Structures are given as structure tokens and as C-alpha cells.
Amino acid sequence: MIKVGIVGGTGYTGVELLRLLAQHPQARVEVITSRSEAGVKVADMYPNLRGHYDDLQFSVPDAQRLGACDVVFFATPHGVAHALAGELLDAGTRVIDLSADFRLADAEEWARWYGQPHGAPALLDEAVYGLPEVNREKIRQARLIAVPGCYPTATQLGLIPLLEAGLADASRLIADCKSGVSGAGRGAKVGSLFCEAGESMMAYAVKGHRHLPEISQGLRRASGGDVGLTFVPHLTPMIRGIHATLYAHVADRSVDLQALFEKRYADEPFVDVMPAGSHPETRSVRGANVCRIAVHRPQGGDLVVVLSVIDNLVKGASGQALQNMNILFGLDERLGLSHAALLP
């Protein structure tokens, strides 16, 4: 049984991690931390978890207790894992970080986007970017895993087949992405209030979103060179979900794009390439660790449109983190993650 610790268990990704781990036959949550809720039972804060964690309580972070775990997940704001990851790694504990702390390979670039110096630059060389569809073999040997963000997951999975094959003009990529409000976190913000977000949709961070360098980094690795990416995120009046509409110029009109995508993801348990002509819906992935993709070439032209949908809290965060844990410990990748999406 894998002994699990969770740092930061009161946000949406933390409680989603608890929900998924409750169904995992080979993992047990030993420690969950929250400074503000120390002493509160998990089941009292989240009644959906009653019967699963009736005795588990939030506690103040304690390096010794966390270091006794086999793996520790960080479901925290950026900067927290910087301070604790090194000590846990020294104790022999594997670290899976759901924050952005170790996603970017360049410490200076991280500092520019997150407005503070990187707190653990010495760990960046060994941090493995936890996108299993790209880095599965590296994940198997990792000590420190950086779980990709939600927009980066949907965007990279949608564009990687075209870039790996050298088919797309990498200098003219567009990612037009929509997110549910849970992507903004559980903290109280005016823009997340029902009266503000309901029955409305808006673009934001058009000048530059923190996920832009992460997406670009992944696409550069796929293409083997520089990329030019325009990334525009939008906030939509739904709780969960990411819908990415991706545009790429593909001059070769003879290539069978459907076959290309099906071949690339044929052995991926959590990527579903839908039949030609499909339009994947966010509701089709709600609560599930799956990315559904459809590829189109409108009017047979050079502009290819890829539609990619995920649940931002599952494949875009906690589910992908658990998928990484399964790989890391040599388990069936689907363990605890094979449940169907919720409909309606």
C-alpha cells in the first residue's frame, strides 16, 4: 500500500485528489495538511467524502510526518513546493507537484511570469514534466514530477501529433481556450462570483497568461524548434471543463490527419481520438481522466482545426497527478482512474 501525503488539501485540486484516491486500491492517505483548517475532519469539510475519510484530519505541515510517506502531492499555490520539496526528496519521499513551481525549465523565465525568484532552482534539472503521453519513461524513474497545467494539457495533446510529424507551420499556432470557473481556484474573488460569471463569457490575460511559456516549452520539444503561439484563454459559466480550439496551418493536403492522430494515441488509455467529424463536448469528460480530441480540415484547406476537451480538475490536474503516481510506482496506469464521465 502506497502511503500518501497531501500538502494543501482544502482547494479544488486537493479535494479532487482525495476523491480519486478514495477509489484507489493501492494507496492510502496518511497525512493531509492545511494551516487554516488544522484539526478539522476531512469528512466534515467535504461531506461527499463521508465513509471514505471519516478519521482523517487536516494538520499543520510537518516535515517528519510527510517524509514518512512514499509520495507527497502538493496541491498548493506557487512557491510552497519550493520550500518543502528538497527536504522531502532528501528523506526518500517522491514529490508530485500540482502547482507551477517546477513546470518551467528556466528559473529566470519562471521568475518573470510569477513575479518572484524561483525558490529551488537546483531542483529544476531533475524535475520531470508529468505529461505521460510524452514523458512516460522519464516519469518511471523520477523523484520530482511537475504536473502540467490544465490549458497546457489540452493544448499540447491537441497539437503534438502535428508538430511531431513536422506537418504544421510551427510559427503560426493559435490556441483559443475556454475554462470553467473552478480553474480560478476556491478562493473568494469577485470575478468568480455567480452573479459575475453566470450567463457571461469573457477573454482574459490576452497580453500574456502564465500558462503561455509552459505551452510553448512543450510545443518546442514536440517540434524540435521554435514556435509562434497565440494563446487566448476565456472564462465560461460552467464549473468544470476546458475546451481548446486549436488552429495550425498544414500545407500538405494529402495527409490523413485522422489516421495520424489515431496512430499517435493508439496506446494511450486516457486520450480518445473521436471519429472524423466529431465535436467533443466538455460534459463528455466531466469527472473523468480523459482528453477527447477531434481533428478537422474545414473546406479541405490549409488551416487545420483540432478540438480538445478535458476536465480541468481531473486530466488537467488531480487525475493526471494520480496517473503519474501509478506510473511512478509501476502500477497499471488506469488504476483508480477508469471510471466513466458524469452525464448529464
Swiss-Prot record:
**Where is the catalytic site?**
150
Supply the enzyme class, top level: oxidoreductase
One of its GO biological process terms is: L-arginine biosynthetic process
- Protein family per UniProt: Belongs to the NAGSA dehydrogenase family. Type 1 subfamily.
The species is: Pseudomonas aeruginosa (strain ATCC 15692 / DSM 22644 / CIP 104116 / JCM 14847 / LMG 12228 / 1C / PRS 101 / PAO1)
The protein's name: N-acetyl-gamma-glutamyl-phosphate reductase
Provide the catalytic activity annotation. Answer: N-acetyl-L-glutamate 5-semialdehyde + phosphate + NADP(+) = N-acetyl-L-glutamyl 5-phosphate + NADPH + H(+)
Enumerate the GO terms in the molecular function aspect. Answer: N-acetyl-gamma-glutamyl-phosphate reductase activity; NAD binding; NADP+ binding
Q: In which pathway does it act?
A: Amino-acid biosynthesis; L-arginine biosynthesis; N(2)-acetyl-L-ornithine from L-glutamate: step 3/4
Q: Which Pfam families match?
A: Semialdhyde_dh, Semialdhyde_dhC_1
